[in-house]
Amino acid sequence: MMTNLQYYLDTFRVSVPQLETLTSTALSHGGDFADLYFEYTTFFSLLLRDGEVSAGGFHTDFGVGIRVLKGEKTGYAYSENTEMSDMLKAAEAASAIALGTDSRMTYTSVTDKKNCFYPDGGNWRQMEASAFLPFIRNLEKEIFSKDSRIVKVIIRLSDSVSDVMMFNSLGELTTDSRPMGSVTATAVFQQGDMTENRSVSRSFRKGVQMIDDALMHEIASEVVRDIDARFEASRPKGGQMSVVMGAGASGILLHEAMGHAFEADFNRKGQSVFSDKMGQRICPEEVSVVDDGTLLYNRGSGNYDDEGVPGEKTYMVRDGILTSYLHDRISAAWYGISPTGNGRRENFRYNPIPRMRATYMENGNADPEGMIASVRHGVYVDEFSNGQVKIGEGDFTFFVKSGYLIENGRLTSPIKDINIIGNGPEALADIAAVGNDLKIDNGTWTCGKEQSVPVSCGMPTVLISNLTVGGE
């Protein structure tokens, strides 16, 4: 995290008096609150396919977004340069939202807290493309060496660094430098006339030091894990049954099926199934659900959100009780509470809205093997792909790529290509056991609620007593 204010002022070619002029202009028609979001981002990627390496590209993005809030209305405009004349035009455009609007909301300063969740990540820009070639070629070689059935390997390495500066009408001035490194490897396996593929990704808010032998060995080993089961797997008969969710990537179901319903914009508008449940028990006592912006080097973490609010660890559910929604400044002002650091945006062209960061369920006390042993008939699932969720009703459907049948307390036949169908509140209420093996999945998770932002997820092993499994 860079703390040298002059670096940011020089990067965006502005002065503090100019920032004050812009916010004054933005409030010239009587808005309640105004803020400026400056951003300079560099992106780089390399792709290895069929043994050939190509530069996926290097590009930059630069600009400022200006927001005005009046009551529950938002005015937003942006400029792709920081010439004062163009920024003043954007501020004037955003200020028009206040015309003819009498309603007001009160915004207060947030705690002046200095976070540092990615302390050594700013060195991507100093590296030449050639510095990464040994890593991706050695990773390709190691993956091929793991299994003779591999016929193709594709590897993508990418990095970005975003320098942001935020200023608002409360006088808060915040800066942050946000690194992101990602590696994705895909292997295609051929066995007779059958083909399977497996992709593994890792992503962190780290600098180039993340590209090391340990990461290479981890990815290569994970790509070939359980591939025999993939070739043997079949679709089971569907129906109502117990489902054991494996630790780690199963957290995506928590994110999609339940996490979005905890975002405050849906709740203040009465659109979430949890809108009237604050302070009530919504699941068993052993369940606590967290959205965390403070995990060191995590893809979803942030020293500050995109409104300049310090990152924090927010308990949405504690001991089975709904205790908090996920707030940006607007929803926090509406509820009369402090924001939780969840105001996020894709880039300066977008208005911030409540978004998750790293969402996970905390550890319980149950033994994962004991959970499986307790199930007479059900499925164990550990790898998901896409899903659909209805925020208002809480209904969800998820596609499961791999897992196992559970028969008489034992994992038996491998399964694939099934759907898990349920309802978020009902699934929470039907949690029968929470394991003691919490795992955060460090894949390249990206949430697409109106905009794309990096997130993370995780879970311990969890037993849900009753879900619909869509199979044969």
Task: Indicate residue ranges for each PLM-predicted region.
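N-terminal small-residue-enriched
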Residues: 1-472
